[in-house]
């Protein structure tokens, strides 16, 4: 049995056509189903529906053999028990710093609000900046507006939400897309099956970008 961990939303919607190219079609619509374990058209493949931030945990600990996770999540997670064999080139966006439009660069210690705490610490350590990182789970744009933080680090798609709240994207930390991740033990135990799936998905990604 191969178990693939996916999260609902944009990543799931963009991954399903790639899985379909490998003959893997869920038995019911994951967006509408309340089930968290969904069989597929292949009797030896099932899908796990989990939170996006939990995909690497399920895969690293072997509860899932494979998963699809955004590079932002993988950068924050920093898991060592994962292979990352394929960039699926879906759910593209940017991980950026942002601050109030026209605000001067703060002097001294910087306060940064983000859910990407590890990424923020690494990024500013590489710059030699002293920072206080404030963990938030959502509505990052609010933090600079009410004086909680000088800057935020967040995923940016169009930047419209930032601008609507008087903020502007500033420094690019990373270009983000979704990646296929594989449990290291599963790759050894089921190498032929998983490598075949990786090759099929790679072909599907390349075909999608040829058009």
From Swiss-Prot:
Biological process according to GO: L-histidine biosynthetic process
Signal peptide range in chain numbering: none
GO terms under cellular component: cytoplasm
InterPro entries: ATP_PRibTrfase_cat, ATP_PRibTrfase_CS, ATP_PRibTrfase_HisG, ATP_PRibTrfase_HisG_short
Pathway named in the protein's UniProt entry: Amino-acid biosynthesis; L-histidine biosynthesis; L-histidine from 5-phospho-alpha-D-ribose 1-diphosphate: step 1/9
Catalytic reaction annotation: 1-(5-phospho-beta-D-ribosyl)-ATP + diphosphate = 5-phospho-alpha-D-ribose 1-diphosphate + ATP
Alphabetized UniProt keyword annotations: Amino-acid biosynthesis, ATP-binding, Cytoplasm, Glycosyltransferase, Histidine biosynthesis, Nucleotide-binding, Transferase
Cellular localization per UniProt: Cytoplasm
Classification via Gene3D superfamilies: Periplasmic binding protein-like II (3.40.190.10)
Domain of life, per lineage: Bacteria
Pfam families cross-referenced by the UniProt entry: HisG (PF01634)
E.C. no: 2.4.2.17
Disulfide bonds: none
Family matches, as NCBIfam families: hisG
Record note on quaternary structure: Heteromultimer composed of HisG and HisZ subunits.
UniProt function note: Catalyzes the condensation of ATP and 5-phosphoribose 1-diphosphate to form N'-(5'-phosphoribosyl)-ATP (PR-ATP). Has a crucial role in the pathway because the rate of histidine biosynthesis seems to be controlled primarily by regulation of HisG enzymatic activity.
Domain notes: Lacks the C-terminal regulatory region which is replaced by HisZ.
Family: Belongs to the ATP phosphoribosyltransferase family. Short subfamily.
Protein name stated in the entry: ATP phosphoribosyltransferase
Lineage, top ranks: Bacteria, Pseudomonadati, Pseudomonadota, Gammaproteobacteria, Pseudomonadales
């Amino acid at each position: 049995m191969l178990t693939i961990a996916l999260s609902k939303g944009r990543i799931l919607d963009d991954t399903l056509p790639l899985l379909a190219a490998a003959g893997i079609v869920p038995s019911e619509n994951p967006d509408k189903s309340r089930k968290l374990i969904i069989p597929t058209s292949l009797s030896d493949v099932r899908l796990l529906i989990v939170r996006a931030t939990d995909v690497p945990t399920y895969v690293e600990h072997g509860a899932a053999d494979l998963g699809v996770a955004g590079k932002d999540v993988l950068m924050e997670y920093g898991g060592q028990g994962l292979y990352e064999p394929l960039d699926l080139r879906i759910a593209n966006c940017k991980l950026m710093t942002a601050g109030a439009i026209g605000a001067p660069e703060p002097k001294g210690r910087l306060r940064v609000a983000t859910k990407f705490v590890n990424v923020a610490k690494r990024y500013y350590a590489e710059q030699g900046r002293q920072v206080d990182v404030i963990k938030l789970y959502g509505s990052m744009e609010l933090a600079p507006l009410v004086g909680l933080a000088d800057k935020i680090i967040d995923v940016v798609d169009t930047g419209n939400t930032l601008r609507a709240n008087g903020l502007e994207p500033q420094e690019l930390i990373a270009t983000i897309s979704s990646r296929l991740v594989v449990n290291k033990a599963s790759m050894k135990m089921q190498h032929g099956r998983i490598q075949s799936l990786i090759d099929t998905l790679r072909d599907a990604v390349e075909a999608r970008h040829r058009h």
